[in-house]
Amino acid sequence: MNNKQNYFGILILVIAMIAFAGCEKDADPVPNATQKLSIHLHTNVGNTEADYVTTFSDGSGRKFTLSDCRYYLSNLVLIKSDGSELPLTDIVLLVNPADQDYELTDVPVGDYKGIKMLFGLDSVTNHTDPAIYPAGDPLAIQTPGIHWDWNSGYIFLKMEGLCDTTIAGNGVADYPFFYHVGMDALKRTIDLSNQPFSVVSGTDKELFVEVDVLEVLANVNLRTENETHTFNNMPLATKIADNFPASIVME
């Protein structure tokens, strides 16, 4: 009798252990730890922070000032250590010199090879109506405006100011210039996938990025190439769009 009791006792114990193990396997997995990711972005003119009061010099020494310098960055993608991609969906940055801190989203803790993004907007976003976005959204109606109502699209880069147009290039910055660069064909991929960083548990991560206006204006002659609405001077708009990826670096 005792042997039978022992046998049934052991059998019940084994069944209980199997059931417990099954419950453990069915338990919800522990979610991966995440931390907040943000970008600290400087818009510089060479080694000087861009602003709307300073007189700057371009690569040839020609003087210019800025009264507007805003641009869109979007479609951010993190490159994981194994080469796979982590898109940061629904994030659009409207960058201007006065605002340097841009909060992105929570991302998994781990090692990353770098980041990719677009200068400008993808075609779907580019052709949405800014009136549908709430005030404060980067895609909402802005003042001054950064959307072409007549062209149904956003201005990816809006740079305006005054420049010296003397032949010798030794005068004062008093002639208006404007570069309004947009249209689907002029979005450009920015590849910073060779800039590794790590997101550590318990510490929010901030990426330090710099855009150099002098690189955006590389090989642009302010005296003779001082205006484009894109459609009316596509070669100049294309030159500026082509320059943009090389203007942005991670510090």
List PLM regions with ranges:
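C-terminal motif of bacterial Sec signal peptides marking the signal peptidase cleavage site
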Residues: 18-22
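A short, solvent-exposed, low-complexity linear motif enriched for acidic/polar residues
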Residues: 24-251
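N-terminal, intrinsically disordered, basic low-complexity segments enriched in Arg/Pro/Ser/Thr
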Residues: 12-15
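Bacterial N-terminal signal peptides that target proteins for export
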Residues: 2-10
